[in-house]
Amino acid sequence: MDLKNGSLVTEFILLGFFGRWELQIFFFVTFSLIYGATVMGNILIMVTVTCRSTLHSPLYFLLGNLSFLDMCLSTATTPKMIIDLLTDHKTISVWGCVTQMFFMHFFGGAEMTLLIIMAFDRYVAICKPLHYRTIMSHKLLKGFAILSWIIGFLHSISQIVLTMNLPFCGHNVINNIFCDLPLVIKLACIETYTLELFVIADSGLLSFTCFILLLVSYIVILVSVPKKSSHGLSKALSTLSAHIIVVTLFFGPCIFIYVWPFSSLASNKTLAVFYTVITPLLNPSIYTLRNKKMQEAIRKLRFQYVSSAQNF
C-alpha cells in the first residue's frame, strides 16, 4: 500500500463482535462448532461422491464441487474470525487482508456460477429426462466446472488489483469481522466513487444477476413439471423450496452489501455471517445429506470403512 502523509499502513484493525467476554466465548464455541461441522460435512460429501460409483453422475459431480467451494469459502474467513474472538487486539496485515478478500470473492464468484449450472442441470433432468445423459456429458461438466473457476478468478482479481493500488493515510479500523472490499475501499485517502461504482457493478451485478437467473430457472421448472405428473410437481416443489432457502440466504446478504450504496449498512456483521458461516453449513444438509441416494452411499461407505478396520 502507498505511503501518504508520512503514515504507512501495515495492518488493519478488525472491530469484530462487540459484547462482554462471556458473549465472546459463546460466539467462539458456536462458530467453532459450525465451522467444524461445515468442514466435516463437506469433506464427507466429497469423499462419498469420489468413492461410490453409484454417485458418478452429473448431479453429484456438481454437488461435490459445491461442497469444495463451500468449504473453501468458509475457510477464507471463519478461522481468523474465530481466533479474533479470543483476542483483544484484532489485527490483520495488509497483505493478509488482500489475500482474504481475494479468496472470498474468488470462491464466492465461483459458487454463484456453479449454482446457475446446477439449476440448468435440474432443468434438464426434470424437463428433458430422455436427453439428460446426452446433454449433460462428461465433457460439458468439466467445461462448466472450469468456467465457474475462471469467472470466480476474473471477478475477484479485477477488484483486488484496483484495491491494492489505493493509498491509505493511517486510518485503518474496519468495522467488520473480516476484510471486505466496501469497507477497505472507504479507508482510502483519495476519492473512490468510481471504484465504488465498479465494485457495485461487479459484485452487486454478479450477485443480483445470478439470483434472478436462479429464480427464473426454478419458475420455469415448476411451470414445466405439471405437464408430466402431480407426483413430479410435489417432488420438484419439495426439492426447489429447500434450494430457494439456501440461495436466498447466500445471495440476499451479498446483494444487500454490494448493491446497496456504500454506507454503514455495508458493515452489517450479521449479513456477513450468513453467507460466510451459515450457508456453507446449510448446503451439505439441504442439497446433499437429505438426498436418500447420498444417505445410502454414506451408510455403505461407513460399513466398508468399519469392515476394513476390523479386518486390519
From Swiss-Prot:
- State the annotated membrane topology for this chain: Multi-pass membrane protein
| Cytoplasmic-facing ranges | 50-57, 121-139, 220-235, 290-312
Gene Ontology cellular-component annotations: plasma membrane
Q: Which Pfam families does the UniProt record give? A: 7tm_4 (PF13853)
> Any stretches that span the bilayer, and where are they?
26-49, 58-79, 101-120, 140-158, 196-219, 236-258, 270-289
Sugar attachment sites are 5, 268
The residues exposed to the Extracellular compartment are 1-25, 80-100, 159-195, 259-269
Q: Where in the cell is it found?
A: Cell membrane
What GO molecular function annotations does the UniProt record carry, in alphabetical order? G protein-coupled receptor activity; olfactory receptor activity
Q: What PANTHER family does this protein map onto?
A: OLFACTORY RECEPTOR
Q: What does this protein do?
A: Odorant receptor.
Concerning its family, UniProt says: Belongs to the G-protein coupled receptor 1 family.
What is the name listed in the Swiss-Prot or TrEMBL entry for this protein?
A: Olfactory receptor 4L1
Species annotation: Homo sapiens (Human)
Taxonomy of the source species: Eukaryota, Metazoa, Chordata, Craniata, Vertebrata
Q: Which gene encodes it?
A: OR4L1
